[in-house]
């Protein structure tokens, strides 16, 4: 029994001294393997008398269990130490300075920048963004917006129509984002307060027009909205967008099928050596159209005009981008010229914010 105790102590000391899993495995094989020291003792039990076998067997198995437990405990310690060492060797110093961005990094397109700017401004006023498909029905693009049959906008020379269907109806590329207003009024109950930015299409191409362009429209429907509210919203938007503390606006009577009364809006400006300065001078620039939503439009969208009223406006995102950032030709916005974009574009990490000033 004393020899067994000595063997047990020796093996446990070897387990404790094992410096890695390979050394620990060698100790296990030497003690518990087929030819191991404890396995050899277990093999002698068959030659003992029944009484000795009972006594020696219990002692040998107890020693085997202690060695097995010690091996498992040491293996856990070694695995934990190995993991700690690996983590220490792979540590990343997060205090290292950032690498400078390459000079040829991409730029944010002025249209994307202006889109973000106006969305931020109107969101600050409580507006949400509504979207709709570019391919629309004649009903949503014209009929529900009070365009009469024979209106010039419904002709082939102004609008991109698809081939007629078997029933005679025609799909088209939307000529404005007003169909999004229609879809909103059909799907939501008042009060409604949305802006509708998106791509629009018309058959036109020159320095100030392209077949595909961008618009943003706004819509407010409730029981008490009036032109005074519309004027305030547009005034606050223009001040924030053009970054001036004061700006004069001029509202002129106009006509749109979907609003009554209809107005066009000019803003005060001064041309100075090729630049346009807003909020001063004696010149005026037209920037948008607006008005009170026509009762026929409300009825077509399932809203009772005797209970609800509202106003809408629309402006070209491309146009206000040109005015703000001094872009002379609308077609340059769509030329995919890297040199032009490197001049007019915005660095991704230097995006203007409403709080910090909209221009870089």
From Swiss-Prot:
Catalytic activity: tRNA(Phe) + L-phenylalanine + ATP = L-phenylalanyl-tRNA(Phe) + AMP + diphosphate + H(+)
A single BP term in Gene Ontology: phenylalanyl-tRNA aminoacylation
GO cellular-component term (any): cytoplasm
Gene3D superfamilies listed in its UniProt record: Bira Bifunctional Protein, Domain 2
Keyword Magnesium assigned: yes
Cofactor(s) of this protein: Mg(2+)
CDD domains: PheRS_alpha_core (cd00496)
EC number of this enzyme: 6.1.1.20
SUPFAM superfamilies noted in UniProt: Class II aaRS and biotin synthetases (SSF55681), tRNA-binding arm (SSF46589)
GO molecular function ontology, one term from the record: ATP binding
Membrane-spanning intervals of the chain: none
Compartments, as annotated in UniProt: Cytoplasm
UniProt feature coiled coil, ranges: none
Keyword Nucleotide-binding: yes
Cofactor, free-text remark: Binds 2 magnesium ions per tetramer.
HAMAP family: Phe_tRNA_synth_alpha1
Quaternary data: Tetramer of two alpha and two beta subunits.
NCBIfam families, A to Z: pheS
Protein name (Swiss-Prot/TrEMBL): Phenylalanine--tRNA ligase alpha subunit
Species, as recorded: Bradyrhizobium diazoefficiens (strain JCM 10833 / BCRC 13528 / IAM 13628 / NBRC 14792 / USDA 110)
Gene that this sequence comes from: pheS
């Amino acid at each position: 029994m004393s020899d067994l105790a000595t063997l047990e102590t020796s093996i446990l000391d070897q387990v404790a001294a094992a410096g890695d899993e390979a050394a620990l495995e060698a100790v296990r094989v030497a003690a518990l393997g087929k030819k191991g020291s404890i396995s050899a003792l277990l093999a002698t039990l068959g030659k003992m008398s029944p009484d000795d076998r009972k006594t020696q067997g219990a002692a040998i198995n107890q020693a085997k269990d202690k060695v097995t437990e010690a091996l498992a405990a040491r293996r856990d310690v070694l695995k934990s130490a190995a993991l700690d060492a690996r983590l220490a060797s792979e540590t990343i110093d997060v205090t290292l300075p950032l690498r400078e961005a390459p000079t040829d990094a991409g730029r944010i397109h002025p249209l994307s920048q202006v889109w973000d700017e106006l969305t931020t401004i109107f969101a600050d006023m409580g507006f949400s963004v509504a979207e709709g498909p570019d391919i629309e029905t004649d009903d949503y693009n014209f009929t529900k917006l009070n365009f009469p049959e024979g209106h010039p906008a419904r002709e082939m020379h102004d609008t991109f129509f698809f081939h007629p269907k078997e029933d005679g109806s025609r799909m088209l590329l939307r000529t404005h984002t007003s169909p999004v207003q229609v879809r909103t009024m059909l799907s939501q109950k008042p009060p409604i307060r949305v802006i509708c930015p998106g791509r629009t299409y018309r058959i036109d191409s020159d320095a100030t027009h392209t077949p595909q362009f961008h618009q943003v429209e706004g819509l407010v429907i409730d029981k008490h909205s009036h032109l005074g509210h519309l004027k305030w919203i547009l005034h606050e938007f223009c001040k924030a967008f053009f970054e001036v503390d004061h700006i004069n606006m001029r509202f002129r009577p106009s006509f749109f099928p979907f609003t009554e009364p209809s107005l066009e809006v000019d803003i005060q400006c001064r041309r100075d050596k090729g630049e346009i300065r807003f909020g001063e001078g004696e010149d005026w620039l037209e920037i948008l159209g607006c008005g009170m939503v026509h009762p026929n439009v409300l009825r077509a969208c399932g809203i009772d005009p005797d209970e609800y009223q509202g106003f809408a406006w629309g402006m070209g995102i491309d146009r206000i981008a040109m005015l703000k950032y001094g872009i002379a030709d609308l077609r340059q916005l769509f030329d995919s010229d890297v040199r032009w974009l490197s001049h007019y574009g915005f660095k991704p990490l230097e995006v203007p914010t409403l709080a910090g000033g909209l221009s870089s």
